[in-house]
Amino acid sequence: MSSSLGKEKDSKEKDPKVPSAKEREKEAKASGGFGKESKEKEPKTKGKDAKDGKKESSAAQPGVAFSVDNTIKRPNPALGTRKKSSNAEVTKELNKCREENSMRLDLSKRSIHILPPSVKELTQLTELYLYSNKLQSLPAEVGCLVNLMTLALSENSLTSLPDSLDNLKKLRMLDLRHNKLREIPSVVYRLDSLTTLYLRFNRITAVEKDVRNLPRLSTLSIRENKIKQLPAEIGELCNLITLDVAHNQLEHLPKEIGNCTQITNLDLQHNELLDLPDTIGNLSSLNRLGLRYNRLSAIPRSLAKCSALEELNLENNNISTLPESLLSSLVKLNSLTLARNCFQLYPVGGPSQFSTIYSLNMEHNRINKIPFGIFSRAKVLSKLNMKDNQLTSLPLDFGTWTSMVELNLATNQLTKIPEDVSGLVSLEVLILSNNLLKKLPHGLGNLRKLRELDLEENKLESLPNEIAYLKDLQKLVLTNNQLTTLPRGIGHLTNLTHLGLGENLLTHLPEEIGTLENLEELYLNDNPNLHSLPFELALCSKLSIMSIENCPLSHLPPQIVAGGPSFIIQFLKMQGPYRAMV
């Protein structure tokens, strides 16, 4: 008797490497919880129309690493609808703006096809928002708005801009994201007061040498285009703080990039970079460097001079080693992602290289050993992801990792967990799925802060009674093991919301399961020896997902099973000693 009332997700997919970074981008999954890529933010609008914005979807894959934009956020859409404005209505808005002498006009999300030429009369405007319309061109009259400082044109169908815009001598922010530009309009290079320029998600193939004419530029975002190279003149942008060239087709960077010494955020992820210039070491203000999903095989030693660096993401390249003592030189580094590379050993440099690291992700490499003492100075290390490596054991000083909060050791070849796991008193998340564990240490019960314990796909035949001490546990995954029984102490886990017991050899469930008052998801599927459910299960009033497929539950009528958890609980109440609760 079976029921498809809910299944646990399989999180064990591996992401094979292939030569092309673009192909790897499609296949590889991001590391959960480590180094997520964030969305580029939107320009802010104010006033009564501020709820009519539109959220921009992220082109990035799941996890981690980061977007380096330092932008301002635009409003959320009102009820997800687009305002439809006739020409008369738009003209009315323009007239109102003129009469009230408003300095700000928001015509975003109005399905506007053509902006009336009468806009030229609004010479007092300093902010004009036209994003998320259907504009294919701008009237030349926009060039009359000589006081304009902000012009937001994202999410239209613009293919060019009128030359008259070069009259906008005060323009500081220009947003052209999500249009149909095949090149950066020549007039843009003449807007020498620009400090912020957004060109994300167009069809731009090149940045011209004329970019040197934008000396005040502090933020330049040209991610998600088709740019194959940057001109040497990019090095003349001495005020540049944020440079986002992610999701393009770059193979090299000009050495002149080293002249942009004010850069703090540099996002180069999802390109085809084969190397980095030594001059990158000149970026003494660099705070975040995103290089994930490229084709790098080495990192220049000069990067050690970027002493302000806090986040370094090298995920999914072809790197097998780092320059010796590189990490020790990066004295402010707190987040390091080396996932999906070719490391067989930990980076050379000794314990001091991890003294400032908060999060270390080395998922999907070929490491077979964590060196003894490597984390002896890692007093702030809270997140360690060693998923999908070749570990067969853990170091003898494993129990000294007292600052660890999240530890992922999934998809290795571990046969045992040391008893001194009891020393990891700060641990909240422990992932041990897809290993070769036959039993768990009694010291596990000392992890009183544990919220999530994942032991899926091991060879466990029983659980220690000490598991009853994990009273903060919310998620316990024991799927695909060899369990025949559960300890009665399972009933002490009253904060449990998710319990995965599918694909085991359970013969029964303890009646104490009825004390799991917060249980919402229970997976019992594929237990061939489970013939009945305890009446106490009826006490789990919050249960909303229950999988019992491929279990020979002969006492449950098929129509009850088909009705889902609420029917099953009702049936157990009627048939058992809890019928008074019906």
UniProtKB/Swiss-Prot annotation:
LRR repeats lie at residues 101-122, 124-145, 147-169, 170-191, 193-215, 216-237, 239-260, 262-283, 285-307, 308-329, 332-353, 356-377, 380-400, 403-424, 426-448, 449-470, 472-494, 495-516, 518-540, 542-563. Residues 1-90 are annotated as: Disordered. A motif (RVxF motif) lies at residues 63-66. GO terms for biological process: cellular response to growth hormone stimulus; cyclic-GMP-AMP transmembrane import across plasma membrane; intracellular signal transduction; negative regulation of neural precursor cell proliferation; negative regulation of neuron differentiation; nerve growth factor signaling pathway; positive regulation of neuron differentiation; positive regulation of neuron projection development. InterPro entries: Leu-rich_rpt, Leu-rich_rpt_typical-subtyp, LRR_dom_sf, LRR_domain-containing, LRR_R13L4/SHOC2-like. It is found in: Cytoplasm; Nucleus. SMART domains: LRR_BAC, LRR_SD22, LRR_TYP. One of its GO terms (molecular function) is volume-sensitive anion channel activity. GO terms for cellular component: cytoplasm; cytosol; nucleoplasm; nucleus; protein phosphatase type 1 complex. Keywords: Cytoplasm, Leucine-rich repeat, Nucleus, Repeat. Residues 1-29, 36-57 have a biased composition (Basic and acidic residues). Contains a N-terminal RVxF motif that is important for interaction with PP1c. Belongs to the SHOC2 family. Component of the SHOC2-MRAS-PP1c (SMP) complex consisting of SHOC2, GTP-bound M-Ras/MRAS and the catalytic subunit of protein phosphatase 1 (either PPP1CA, PPP1CB or PPP1CC). SHOC2 and PP1c preferably bind M-Ras/MRAS, but they also bind K-Ras/KRAS, N-Ras/NRAS and H-Ras/HRAS; these interactions are GTP-dependent and both SHOC2 and PP1c are required to form a stable complex. Interacts with PP1c in the absence of Ras GTPases. Interacts with M-Ras/MRAS and RAF1. Interacts with ERBIN; disrupts the interaction with RAF1 and Ras, preventing the activation of the Ras signaling pathway. Core component of the SHOC2-MRAS-PP1c (SMP) holophosphatase complex that regulates activation of the MAPK pathway. Acts as a scaffolding protein in the SMP complex. The SMP complex specifically dephosphorylates the inhibitory phosphorylation at 'Ser-259' of RAF1 kinase, 'Ser-365' of BRAF kinase and 'Ser-214' of ARAF kinase, stimulating their kinase activities. The SMP complex enhances the dephosphorylation activity and substrate specificity of PP1c. This is Leucine-rich repeat protein SHOC-2. It comes from Rattus norvegicus. The gene is Shoc2.
